[in-house]
């Protein structure tokens, strides 16, 4: 239990230092005003949420940048940084090819006529027929013992 509490405190301190947990920007107690703390928190978060993402460099690396915006920022920062254009790897699923599929049967099946015309000998299983004359012999004693039958 002590280790869990210590680990939780350590994670909280690391997140606080990294800036993941925002500091309290609005005091809970105000002088002379009767304002609910939830409203002040919403105002504080609203202003934080409206700030542009350019100020937050941590999120810029995670979010995809549109190509128009990429070209505009490339002109501004061409001397300091070089931008790599992102490739849309899902475009073939969003825009499927028109027309029939390619015929790829030749990969798995040979195309030569000699192989196709050649008949493969098929072996048929030999069925043995047993003609019974009269009633069938009782073979239950092989799989069932007398003890299992429950007869005295």
From Swiss-Prot:
Highly expressed in the small intestine where it shows a proximal-distal graded expression. Pfam families: PRAP. This is Proline-rich acidic protein 1. It comes from the Eukaryota. Its main location: secreted. The gene is Prap1. One of its GO terms (molecular function) is triglyceride binding. GO terms for biological process: cellular response to X-ray; deactivation of mitotic spindle assembly checkpoint; DNA damage response; DNA damage response, signal transduction by p53 class mediator; negative regulation of apoptotic process; positive regulation of intestinal lipid absorption; positive regulation of phospholipid transport; positive regulation of triglyceride transport. It comes from Rattus norvegicus. Keywords: Endoplasmic reticulum, Lipid-binding, Secreted, Signal. It is found in: Secreted; Endoplasmic reticulum. Residues 1-20 form the signal peptide. The lineage of its organism: Eukaryota, Metazoa, Chordata, Craniata, Vertebrata. PANTHER family: PROLINE-RICH ACIDIC PROTEIN 1 (PTHR37861:SF1). Lipid-binding protein which promotes lipid absorption by facilitating MTTP-mediated lipid transfer (mainly triglycerides and phospholipids) and MTTP-mediated apoB lipoprotein assembly and secretion. Protects the gastrointestinal epithelium from irradiation-induced apoptosis. May play an important role in maintaining normal growth homeostasis in epithelial cells. Involved in p53/TP53-dependent cell survival after DNA damage. One of its GO terms (cellular component) is extracellular region.
């Amino acid at each position: 239990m002590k280790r869990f509490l210590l680990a939780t405190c350590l994670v909280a301190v690391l997140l606080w230092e990294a800036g993941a947990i925002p500091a309290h920007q609005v005091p809970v107690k105000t002088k002379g005003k009767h304002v609910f703390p939830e409203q002040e928190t919403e105002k504080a978060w609203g202003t934080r949420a409206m700030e542009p993402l350019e100020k937050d460099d941590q999120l810029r690396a995670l979010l995809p940048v549109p190509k128009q915006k990429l070209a505009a920022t490339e002109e501004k920062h061409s001397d300091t940084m070089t931008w790599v254009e992102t490739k849309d790897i899902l475009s073939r699923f969003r825009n499927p090819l028109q027309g029939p599929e390619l015929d790829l049967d030749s990969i798995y099946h040979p195309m030569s006529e000699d192989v196709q015309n050649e008949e493969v000998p098929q072996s048929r299983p030999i069925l043995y027929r047993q003609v019974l004359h009269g009633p069938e012999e009782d073979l239950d004693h092989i799989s069932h013992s007398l003890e299992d039958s429950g007869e005295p």
